Amino acid sequence: MLTSEQQTHKPKQSKIRYTEYYDLQSTFDRLYADSLKGKTFHNLIGLMASEENIKLAYRTIKGNKGSGTPGVDKRTIKHLASMEEEKFVRLIQKQFSWYNPRPVRRVEIPKPNGKTRPLGIPTIVDRIVQQCILQVLEPICEAKFHERSNGFRPNRSTEHAIAQCCRLMQIQHLHYAVDLDVHGFFDNVNHGKLIRQMWELGIRDKKLLCIIKQMLKAPIVLPDGKRVYPTKGTPQGGILSPLLSNIVLNELDWWVSSQWENMPTHYEYKTRQNARGTDIKSHTYRALRRSNLKEMYLVRYADDFKIFCRSYKDAVKTFEATKKWLKDRLGLDISPEKSKVINMEQRYSEFLGFKMKLYRKGKKYVVCSHMSDKAVTHAKEKISAAIKAIQTPADSHSQYIAIQQYNSVVAGLHNYYRLATRVSEDFPNLAQGLKKQMSNRLRGLTRNGKLERGFIKERYGKSKQLRFLNGHPLIPIGYVQTRDAQHKKKTVNRYTPEGRAEIHKNLGVNTDTMIWLMRTPVLDKSIEFADNRISLFAAQYGRCAITGTELMPYDIGCHHKVPLENGGTDKYSNLVLVTEAVHLLIHATLEETIQKYLKQLQLNKKQLEKLNKLRKLAGTPAIA
C-alpha cells in the first residue's frame, strides 16, 4: 500500500514555512529531541513570550478562518493588525507576566443530528497567547504521543486512522471491534488530572501550569448574557483545547498499548522496519500469543476511538476493563447506548463517518466500507442547500458564486468519502435521491458546455453525468471512484530535518537576510506590515521585484503599491520588496534624481515597464 507522502513533489507546508520565517525551527527541533530523551522542561515561559514566537503566533492566527470571529470584547484580528509591531509584542508579553484570561463567549453550533455543539470563543488576545503556548508545547508532546493517535496532530488525518483500521481488520485478522463512546468528553475533563498528566510528560514550568489552570477556569458568557464558572472540561473552540484533549487521552493510548504490543518479554526478540519505517514485531507477537494476554490495538482520532480484538471473549473483557479504567483513571463515563462489542463479520462498525464490515472473498476476509447512514443524511442536506442557493440568485454573478459553492461542497464530500470501498454505490444512490430536486429547481441544465483546464476537467471531464448551467459546469454527484486509505509514513515528522525533507521544500532564500528582516522592525509600522514583509521576502526568493538582484540587509525597501495616503493598506497584495535605489526611483520626481538612479541601475526595457507600473500606482509619471 502506498503512503500519502510517497510523492516526488514536495509542497511547501505553510506551518513549517511560517516557523522558518521566524527562525524557530531549530528551537522546536531541540524541544522535540529533548522530550524524546525524557528531559523535563522548567522554563518555557521565556520562549513562549519571545518576540519571534509572538510574531509566529500572530501569523498563524491571521491565517485561521476563525480570526474574524469576535470574542466577548468584540475585537478580531483586524484590530491587532493595525497596531505598531513593538506595541503588539509588548501587549502579548504583558499577558505572560500577569495572566488574567477574559471570559469566553459561548456559541451553539448546529450538529447533523439536530442537536447543538457548544463552542467557547476566547478573545483575540487570549487566542494569540494560547497559540504562543501551543507552538512550544506541541513538539514536546509530539515526542510522547502514540503512533495511532491521529486527531489534531501535524501530518495526520482521518485517512491515516481509516488505513490503520483496515490493516488491523484485513491484514492482522482482528474481526472484533470494541466501540466506546465517552459521554461528553470535552465537558468532563478533570482539570487537576490534566495538570498532573502534563507534569508527567515533562512540562514542569509551574508558572505555565498556573496559566493553563486559569485558562481552563475562565468564565463562560452564555448567549443570554449569564456567566458560568467551569470546574471541569476544556472549551471546544479554544486554540489549546485539541492539544489538551490529546494529553488527557494519551494515557489511554499507552495503557491499551501496554496490555499487548508493548508488553515486555523475558527474551528480547529482534525487530525490523518496513519501507514506511514501521516496526515489524512478528517474533514478539508470536511469543505473546502463547500467553494468556488479550490481543488488542487502539486506533484513535480525538475522542473517537476503537479497540480491535481477535476473539469475542477478548473483546468483552477489553470492553469492561477499558470502561472501568476510563472511570477510575480519568473520571470519564461511557454512553451505554452507543458503546458495544461488534463482530465485524456480521455487523457494521461506524468510525469517522464510515461504516466498516468484513465479508468473505474466497478463503479470506476483506474490508467493505460505506458512508455511514448519518453521513449520507448530512451529505444530502448539504448538497440540497447548495442546490437551493443556485436556484434563487440575486444576479448572474451571485449564481456563479453559488455554483462554485455547490462544486466545492460536492468535491469536498467526494474527497473525504472516496476512502470507502463502496463509495461508487453510495454517491450514485445520493444522486438519484436528489435528481428530482435538481431538475425541478435548476431549469436550463444542459449537457452542452465547454470545460476550461483545471480540477473539474481533470477529475470529472470524462463523466457523462456532467451538466452545465448558463455555461458553468456542475460537478456530478454520482461520479466518484474509491481510493485506498494510505498510511502515514512513520519517518515523516515536522520536528526532525529528515522528517521534514519527506514533505517540505526548504526556503530557497538567504536565511541570514531573512533573520535580519525579522529582527529589524520598521518603526511606526503595523504588525501586519512587518509580517507581510517577511512573507514577501520568501515569495520573491529574496530578490528585488524589479531588478532581480539579491536583497541584502540595509538595502531593502518595502513599497506600498497604492500609497497609504491614497487609500492603500498594509495587506500582502499591496506590498512589494525592492532595493533602496529602486524604491527611491519609484517615488522620484526631479529629473536629476531620476537620471542618477537610472544610470546606477541600468534597467532594461522589461524592468523599466515594471518600474513604470509601480510609478503609475504611486501617482508619479512614467519614465520615458
Place the predicted regions along the sequence by residue:
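Conserved polymerase palm-domain catalytic core
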Residues: 88, 96, 103, 144-148, ...
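Short cysteine-rich loop/turn motifs with clustered Cys
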Residues: 527-557, 579-581
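Right-hand nucleic-acid polymerase module
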Residues: 1-2, 377-449
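Extended C-terminal regions of large enzymes
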Residues: 430-434, 440-524, 602
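Histidine-centered nuclease catalytic patch
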Residues: 181, 548-580, 588-594
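A conserved non-catalytic segment of reverse transcriptases
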Residues: 217, 223-226, 330-395, 410-411
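Non-catalytic, polymerase-adjacent accessory regions of viral genome-replication enzymes
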Residues: 1-86
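Polybasic, low-complexity binding patches
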Residues: 565-573, 585-624
